[in-house]
């Protein structure tokens, strides 16, 4: 930049010197400007006006005089003077330029060196100041950076803690959401199940109401029948008394006649026929004696003269079966007392219960088998055969004992094992806090309350399903199916 300034000043000085020299040499000549360009410099000259030139008014106005040539010698002389002057000035300017270039180089170098030294000192001072300021700014920036780093580290730690806490909370939220979804699913399932149970309960309540109405009708009919039977019983009792009196009179008459006819015979000979009467303990003995027809036979309690009427099945599986229970038409009410189940009730040729006491005494004399024959309302039949069966005495509530199940009415025994005590409506010996005999009706070997009850309420066809208190054998038809008919019969194991 200093070189450019210096060169500009030099050009101005040269131009000024040339101008002054030319003006001094041209003082006597008229002034006219003439500019010359040389290199980077431009020169302006003031040229004199010629006195020998004529004025426009001195010319002849006609065309011949205007086209006539001027004075040639005078013009040539003036041009030569001007050329000489121009040549001298040019030579002088060239010398001046060379002088300026030779002499000004040293000064320009010195000026450049001085400018560089001054600039260097200034720049060094400026650089020193800048370095000091930079160092101060760097120190401040270092402090700020350390503070920022500490603050950033603290924020990163807080952010990490918040992130861990957030992850933990998110995990807890996910777990709680999953648990809520599970609970919602379970709640939906339970609600659906409750609705289904409500529907089932409504159906069952309707069915129970219908059963209740039917039972009320049946009870009314049975009450009428009972009243009629009571009347018939009174009549039969009266007739029986008359018949017994007549029989007694006839026996006395016969005895008198026998005494009159054979006065020599002793009383022992009179009752020979009675002493020769055959005693049967069960239907197997009846069968072995040659009586092989189904029917009612008189059996005698073991070690006793007490007799009982029993139905003997002489055809099923070889015969010799003593029937201890039969259900076929619902004509007999099996909701009886303990005493009635002990001695038996019903008609041996139809629905009846033979009696727990007789079965206990018979089955404790020798090993017996128990066969249970079942019928459903669709015409199907099945059976369960227990290879060993006996009852305990009344002191043990006629507890049942069974072993060795075979048959087609289920692979599992529907009579719970080990043996259960017998229960009736007035003797609750089951294993339930409820009273199974009252709930399910009938006397049976209830557990709590167990999968079977062949002495339950008798239901006719199309009313025999969904009955919890009917005649049931769970492992053949389920708990809600009431059977059409059942037969329980016993026979010695060695028959």
Curated annotation (Swiss-Prot):
Residues bearing attached sugar chains per UniProt: 88, 118, 132, 150, 239, 303
Name any one GO molecular function.
Answer: receptor tyrosine kinase binding
Q: What is the organism field in this record?
A: Canis lupus familiaris (Dog)
**Subunit:** Interacts with TEK/TIE2, competing for the same binding site as ANGPT1. Interacts with ITGA5. Interacts with SVEP1/polydom. Interacts with THBD; this interaction significantly inhibits the generation of activated PC and TAFIa/CPB2 by the thrombin/thrombomodulin complex.
Keyword list, A-Z = Angiogenesis, Calcium, Coiled coil, Developmental protein, Differentiation, Disulfide bond, Glycoprotein, Metal-binding, Secreted, Signal
One matching Pfam family, short form? Fibrinogen_C
Q: What does this protein do?
A: Binds to TEK/TIE2, competing for the ANGPT1 binding site, and modulating ANGPT1 signaling. Can induce tyrosine phosphorylation of TEK/TIE2 in the absence of ANGPT1. In the absence of angiogenic inducers, such as VEGF, ANGPT2-mediated loosening of cell-matrix contacts may induce endothelial cell apoptosis with consequent vascular regression. In concert with VEGF, it may facilitate endothelial cell migration and proliferation, thus serving as a permissive angiogenic signal. Involved in the regulation of lymphangiogenesis.
Disulfide pattern: 283-312, 432-434, 436-449
Which sequence ranges form a coiled-coil region, renumbered to this chain? 165-247
Alphabetical GO CC annotations of the entry are: collagen-containing extracellular matrix; extracellular space
Domain Fibrinogen C-terminal span(s) in chain numbering: 274-494
Q: Tell me which positions the record assigns to the signal sequence.
A: 1-18
The name this protein goes by in its record:
Angiopoietin-2
């Amino acid at each position: 930049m200093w070189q450019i300034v210096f060169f500009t000043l030099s050009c101005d000085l040269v131009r000024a010197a040339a101008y002054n020299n030319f003006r001094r040499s041209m003082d006597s000549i008229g002034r006219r400007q003439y500019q010359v360009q040389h290199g980077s410099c431009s020169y302006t000259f003031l040229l004199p006006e010629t006195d020998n030139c004529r004025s426009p008014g001195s010319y002849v106005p006609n065309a011949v005089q205007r086209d006539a040539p001027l004075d040639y010698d005078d013009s040539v002389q003036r041009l030569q003077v001007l050329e000489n002057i121009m040549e001298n000035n040019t030579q002088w300017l060239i010398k001046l330029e060379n002088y300026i270039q030779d002499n000004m180089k040293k000064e320009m170098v010195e000026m450049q060196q001085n400018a560089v030294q001054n600039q260097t000192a200034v720049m060094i001072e400026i650089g020193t100041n800048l370095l000091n300021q930079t160092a101060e700014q760097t120190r401040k920036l270092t402090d700020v950076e350390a503070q920022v780093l500490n603050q950033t580290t603290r924020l990163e730690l807080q952010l990490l803690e918040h992130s861990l806490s957030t992850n933990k909370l998110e995990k807890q939220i996910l777990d709680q959401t999953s648990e809520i979804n599970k609970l919602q699913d379970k709640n939906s399932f339970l609600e659906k199940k409750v609705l289904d149970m409500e529907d089932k309960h409504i159906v069952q309540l309707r069915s129970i109401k219908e059963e209740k109405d039917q039972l009320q009708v049946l009870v009314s009919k049975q009450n009428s029948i009972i009243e009629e039977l009571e009347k018939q019983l009174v009549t039969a009792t009266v007739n029986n008394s008359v018949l017994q009196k007549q029989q007694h009179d006839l026996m006395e008459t016969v005895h008198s006649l026998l005494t009159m006819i054979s006065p020599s015979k002793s009383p022992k000979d009179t009752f020979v026929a009675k002493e020769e009467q055959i005693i049967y303990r069960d239907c197997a003995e009846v069968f072995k004696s040659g009586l092989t027809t189904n029917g009612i036979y008189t059996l005698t309690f073991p070690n006793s003269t007490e007799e009982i009427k029993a139905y003997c099945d002489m055809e099923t599986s070889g015969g010799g079966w003593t029937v201890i229970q039969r259900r076929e038409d619902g004509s007999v009410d099996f909701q009886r007392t303990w005493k009635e189940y002990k001695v038996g009730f019903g008609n041996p040729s139809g629905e009846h219960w033979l009696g727990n006491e007789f079965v206990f005494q018979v089955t404790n004399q020798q090993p017996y088998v128990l066969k249970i024959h079942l019928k459903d309302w669709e015409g199907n039949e099945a059976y369960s055969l227990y290879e060993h069966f006996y009852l305990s005495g009344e002191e043990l509530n006629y507890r049942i004992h069974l072993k060795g199940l075979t048959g087609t009415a289920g692979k599992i025994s529907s009579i719970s094992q080990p043996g259960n005590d017998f229960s009736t409506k007035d003797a609750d010996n089951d294993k339930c806090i409820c009273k199974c005999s009252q709930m399910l009706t009938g006397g049976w070997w209830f557990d709590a309350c167990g999968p079977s009850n062949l002495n339950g309420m008798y239901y006719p066809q199309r009313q025999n399903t969904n009955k919890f208190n009917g005649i049931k054998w769970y492992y053949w038809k389920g708990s809600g199916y009431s059977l059409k008919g059942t037969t329980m019969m016993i026979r010695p194991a060695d028959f």
